[in-house]
Amino acid sequence: MDLLFAKIICIGIFLVVTTFGCFIPHLMGLYKEKENEEKNKRVKNILSNLNCFGSGFIFSIIMFHLLPETIHIISDHGNIRIFNTSDSQMKILYIFFFVFIGFCMQLGLEYVLPVDTNICCVSNLDSKKKLEDTLSQHITKNASTTVNIEMQNIDNIDHIHEHSCEGVHTHDEKSIGKFLEILTLQSFFLTISLAIHSCIEGMIIGTSTDVNYVFISSFCILLHKWIAGVTVSLSLNSNNMNKTLKAILLLTFVFASPLGIVLGHMAKSAGQKVTCLINAVSIGTLLFIGCEILLNEIKQNISRKVRLCKWLSFCFSCLIAFALISFTTSMAPHTHGDIDTHVHVHHHDHDHDHGHNH
């Protein structure tokens, strides 16, 4: 199959899965109470194990494919220079520096940018809990055991807005207040940060040079993509935000991964140096996401048996990913154009010198 055609197929799949994830709350009627407690428990177990399974695939695609391949390309290509050096050891060190940049960037998006809590992983976990809670017959609007971060933010915003407008009723200040209200909404930062994260994930697919790895990487990312769509949908629907702005934010999130695939494919033509640096930043981002999802699942106040099941889901997905990557590599090993060209030129020069001597 043609590489470009494979990426186009993945773009279509991402659009469908992401859109479906955003509509899951509406399709399942999650804003209403349900009375089937057994169904609630089953959904809870499926969501938890699916999160652990997805984090295992994320971890595996980093450790067994992206990181080794990036290091291999950088170390074997003497013509690639990073920060004006062609030394292999220094270039590998710089690659890990860009991994560190990606890790810190995702850390900032989750723990520095938000108002109250981190965005991607814990919000996904909160959304998962919200999905579970709304399916339970014992849910009440003001349950004391559940902390509704979004509504708490709105109450704080309303209080700040009322306090700031005491004695002042000018049109300009009201407009500024509405603008600040939007910026301080947790859901606004949540959607933007998840869109950035999705775009970076898409770049990994876009920079791939092998059809098999395009589909493997897509499968790895799609395993947790739907829950991100649920997160965005639940968050936006819990705020009194303008419908136009909601639509813009939803479309931004839905088209983020396809945009990343397109940008990654364009960057691939810029050379292997750019591809390796993009992959390094993506590795740092995915490493943070994969570990954070797993830790948030396992550290919950649950029994040892449930923890064991989640750990086994993680390990099982890692083994599946390792088997897929090993099989793909053995069936269609990578060939790097620059190395082959260098060997061909060297061989041609050697034959030319040999003929000249005779």
Curated annotation (Swiss-Prot):
What topology does the record note for this protein and the membrane? Multi-pass membrane protein
Would the keyword Cell membrane be found if you checked this record's keyword annotation? Answer: yes
Residue spans crossing the bilayer: 8-28, 54-74, 92-112, 187-207, 214-234, 247-267, 274-294, 311-331
Per the UniProt topology annotation, the Extracellular ranges are 1-7, 75-91, 208-213, 268-273, 332-358
* Localisation: Plastid, Apicoplast; Cell membrane
Domain note? C-terminal histidine-rich loop acts as a negative regulator for Fe(2+) binding and thus determines selectivity for Zn(2+).
Protein family per UniProt: Belongs to the ZIP transporter (TC 2.A.5) family.
Against PANTHER family, the record matches this protein to: ZINC/IRON TRANSPORTER (PTHR11040), ZRT (ZRT), IRT- (IRT-) LIKE PROTEIN TRANSPORTER (PTHR11040:SF140)
**What's this protein's name?**
Zinc transporter ZIP1
Species name: Plasmodium falciparum (isolate 3D7)
